[in-house]
């Protein structure tokens, strides 16, 4: 019985020891499972250096902000644009000197002389000599072109004389080419104005200080008598006096027309252009390039 109890106690001790060993083994097996999540916790604890690494680039951002000031320094380039705007402003005043140069290069008298040179009728002397009857007709009071102050009413031609001069003028005007009629009529009126100036109807500017009142009145009376006593042979006499006409042309090249003479020239020209074509039943084409702009001062065309 004692042996049985001993064996029973041994068995109990063995079973308890085995149970303890099993529990220890089980606990040993469970502890590594519990210890395995600990390293991730340590890894999570190691994340602060990562946060520190994240914090380290953050201080590097000021370096980017420090690099931005040079970009802000590029803004002075925009501030450098005002000098460009300042350069544009001096360009505009540079245009004004060009306009001033145009005004300085062409004084008023030179501009008028250029206009006159462009509008002086270019007509052959033979054509003007051919239209000499028209010139004599226009100089007398039998035409509306003649002015009252040039001739007295008592010296007016008779209607028969005017009719004869009218026929001669129309015959010569019809023989001139149509394209040359306008310039020829304008040249005749121009020569009449200059002839009046030479004969003393209008005093030239250069001769005003030298002439006296009595000399002017005598020259006007002589010219009125010459124009009032014109005969039908006057055109033929003038046709044969070419040397005298050349001398008159040389003398009158230095004469100048005054502004009131220019207005008188335009008025007489417009009347003649309305009278002669209707009177002679001829076509006189008008050119706007010469009719719209008046004559200037300082012309040098002689009377034919």
UniProtKB/Swiss-Prot annotation:
Keyword annotations of the record: Repeat, Seed storage protein, Signal, Storage protein
Family as reported in the entry's similarity comment: Belongs to the gliadin/glutenin family.
Compositional bias ranges of the Low complexity kind: 41-92
Functional description taken from the UniProt entry: Gliadin is the major seed storage protein in wheat.
The organism's place on the tree of life at top rank: Eukaryota
Gene3D superfamilies: Plant lipid-transfer and hydrophobic proteins (1.10.110.10)
Protein name: Gamma-gliadin B-I
Other remarks in the entry: The gamma-gliadins can be divided into 3 homology classes. Sequence divergence between the classes is due to single-base substitutions and to duplications or deletions within or near direct repeats.
Segments for region (Disordered): 32-92
Transmembrane intervals: none
The keyword Signal is assigned to this record: yes
Organism: Triticum aestivum (Wheat)
Keyword 4Fe-4S among UniProt keywords: no
Database matches in Pfam families: Gliadin
Cysteine-cysteine disulfides: none
SMART domains: AAI (SM00499)
InterPro entries, sorted: Bifun_inhib/LTP/seed_sf, Bifunc_inhib/LTP/seed_store, Glia_glutenin
């Amino acid at each position: 019985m004692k042996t049985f109890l001993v064996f029973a106690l041994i068995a109990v001790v063995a079973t308890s020891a085995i149970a303890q060993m099993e529990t220890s083994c089980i606990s040993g097996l469970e502890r590594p499972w519990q210890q395995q999540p600990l390293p991730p916790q340590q890894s999570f604890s190691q994340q602060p250096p990562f946060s520190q690494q994240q914090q380290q680039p953050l201080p590097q951002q000021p370096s980017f902000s420090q690099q931005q000031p040079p970009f802000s320094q590029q803004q002075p380039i925009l501030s450098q644009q005002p000098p460009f705007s300042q350069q544009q402003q001096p360009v505009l005043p540079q245009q004004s000197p060009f306009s001033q140069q145009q005004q300085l290069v062409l004084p008023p008298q030179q501009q008028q002389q250029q206009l006159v040179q462009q509008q002086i009728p270019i007509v052959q002397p033979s054509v003007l000599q051919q239209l000499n009857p028209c010139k004599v007709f226009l100089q007398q009071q039998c035409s509306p072109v003649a002015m009252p102050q040039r001739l007295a009413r008592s010296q007016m031609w008779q209607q028969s004389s005017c009719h004869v001069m009218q026929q001669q003028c129309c015959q010569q005007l019809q023989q001139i080419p149509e394209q040359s009629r306008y310039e020829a009529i304008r040249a005749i009126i121009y020569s009449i104005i200059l002839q009046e100036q030479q004969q003393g109807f209008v005093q030239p500017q250069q001769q005003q200080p030298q002439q006296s009142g009595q000399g002017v009145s005598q020259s006007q009376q002589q010219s009125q008598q010459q124009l009032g006593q014109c005969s039908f042979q006057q055109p033929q006499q003038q046709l044969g006096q070419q040397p005298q006409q050349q001398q008159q042309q040389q003398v009158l090249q230095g004469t100048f027309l005054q502004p009131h003479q220019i207005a008188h020239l335009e008025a007489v020209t417009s009347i003649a252009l309305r009278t002669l074509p209707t009177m002679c039943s001829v076509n006189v084409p008008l050119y706007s390039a010469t009719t719209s702009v008046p004559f200037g001062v300082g012309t040098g065309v002689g009377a034919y």
